Design a protein with these regions (language model features):
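P-loop NTPase motor domains
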Residues: 1-95, 111, 163, 172-199, ...
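Structural recognition of the conserved hydrophobic beta-strand(s) that form the central parallel beta-sheet
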Residues: 96-102
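Conserved beta-strand segments of the P-loop GTPase G domain that flank and frequently precede/overlap
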Residues: 32-33, 70, 100, 128-130
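Acidic, glycine-rich active-site loops and adjacent beta-strand->loop/helix elements
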Residues: 75, 103-105
């Protein structure tokens, strides 16, 4: 089993220690690239590396500096042992998490619905891009809650003029999410009203 997991670069004698790098700080950046070809085979290794880093960040007695975790395609790392504690309790210890997910069902499938809900609810700020599945849209809508809306429209009956109707609705509706253009997101910061934000296309700096 071990021979099947430790393939490629993971067969070599390593010089990198996740625990030491987190403990010693120094502004180091660690890239762990997921190999789509053999990623499923290497998942235990990826999971171990990330779990070790999270555990080390949580083992500090106080905030000894920030440790940032940027994880894209979070569903590819199922069953991280310390992720729930990291997201929900690591903030006071300087552990910061930024996750990219395609939809909420993927996280529920990887971690179970209850644990997935606990993980997602632990994030302070959400950037909601356009999603097509109903479950993810429902999550975004429920996250921002409801309000009272005043709708104004012309009456279908002649001579009645303008009609006003008060109804309860979501702060962000399905149409708000599905009509988002590429690169635009609805930002949901804690304690503030949501707003739209257009990201600019990244351009490499021009060397002088």
């Amino acid at each position: 089993m071990i021979r099947e997991i430790f393939v490629g670069n993971f067969r070599k004698n390593g010089t990198l220690s996740m625990r030491q790098l987190v403990r010693n700080k120094g502004g180091r950046v660690i890239f762990v690239e997921y190999d789509l070809g053999i990623g499923a085979m290497l998942t235990p290794v990826y999971r171990l590396l990330i779990d070790l880093a999270i555990k080390e960040a949580l083992c500090r007695t106080s905030n000894e500096g920030n440790v940032y975790f940027f994880i894209d395609e979070f569903r590819l790392l199922p069953h991280l042992e310390h992720i729930d504690d990291g997201v929900n309790f690591g903030r006071s210890l300087g552990a910061k998490f930024v996750f990219g997910i395609q939809n909420t069902d993927q996280i529920a499938a990887a971690y179970g619905r209850d644990l997935a809900h606990s993980i997602l609810s632990g994030f302070g700020t959400t950037f909601a891009f356009r999603v097509n599945d109903a479950e993810s849209r429902e999550y975004i809508k429920e996250l921002l809650g409801k309000n009272i809306k005043l709708q104004t429209f012309m009456s279908a009956v002649q001579n009645r003029g303008v009609t006003e109707q008060i109804r309860e609705g979501y702060v962000v509706e399905d149409s708000d999410i599905t009509n988002l253009p590429v690169g635009q997101a609805i930002v949901c910061p804690p304690g503030c009203l949501p707003f739209r934000f257009q990201f600019r296309l990244y351009e490499s700096p021009v060397s002088s």
